[in-house]
Amino acid sequence: MSIVENILSLRERFTAKLQKANIFDNFFMRVVLENKEVCQYVLRKLLKKPDIIVLDCKTEVQISKLFGKDSRLDVLATDKTGKIFNIEIQKAKEDAHELRVRYYHSAVDSEIIRKGKEYSDLPPVYVIYVSKTDIWEKGSAVYMVEKSLKYHGKADIYDDKQYTLYVNAEVKDNSEQDISALMEYFKICNPDDDTHGALSEYVRYLKTDKKGNDIMYDEFEREFEGDIRKRTKADDIAKIMLDFKVSFERALKTLDIPEEEHDDYAELLRYFYPNVMQ
């Protein structure tokens, strides 16, 4: 698809995509789960802790570099007791899940220490790894990691305040009906389904209300912000050409536009400013 087609069809594509959008779509997830009431509802359901009170919730959190690698967490929340919750939504088929979770724990701890906390003050951190498929292939919707301290053939609970929960949307688990129902909703996000409290309310608002649609369109545009930025820059090129009566090439040079982008701008100006490009 050309850059012009990309820009012209953006609203049309958005309308179709929004109706099918679910929590496994990044542009939808980052809006839905940043809502504090929604985040609280989801955490209470997944952790079976109805008393969680979320004070702060952010999505796509960029944190300081860890071992030279940029770290971005899908959802990072804090409750009133100081506990930290990291929810990671895995859509694609990946491997080394346990190493990914180890990295998420390290990233969160690294950020806490960077902000001046002592080791003894490290709060409990929960990493909740949500996947579309049953990555462990054991037929369960939920997997809880428990650490133990082994000695003389015995084993005691080893509590380092790092907790890991794996949840998947593939298995319909009769022993985890509430979580399975939530995962089913994650996959569909039907605005007519009102069975999931704050989550259902916000999804319905985003999908059916004009103001909610506008919020989602702004988020959807982020995925195409490079093309949209070029569209704005094309206006600048045309203005320079008209005001100063210079060539297309001269306008590009004035704005210091890289040579590899020249064809895109030529296409944009031919479409939006055909008289200028004659």
Model-derived regions, located:
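Extended serine/threonine-enriched, polar tracts that run as long, contiguous segments within proteins
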Residues: N168-E170, N174
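Low-complexity, glycine/alanine/valine/leucine- and proline-rich hydrophobic stretches
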Residues: Y151-K161, L165, D178, L182-C189
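Short, charged alpha-helical interaction segments and adjacent helix-coil junctions
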Residues: S2-I23, F27, T78-T81, F85-Q90, ...
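Accessory alpha/beta interaction modules
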Residues: M1-Y163, D173, Q278
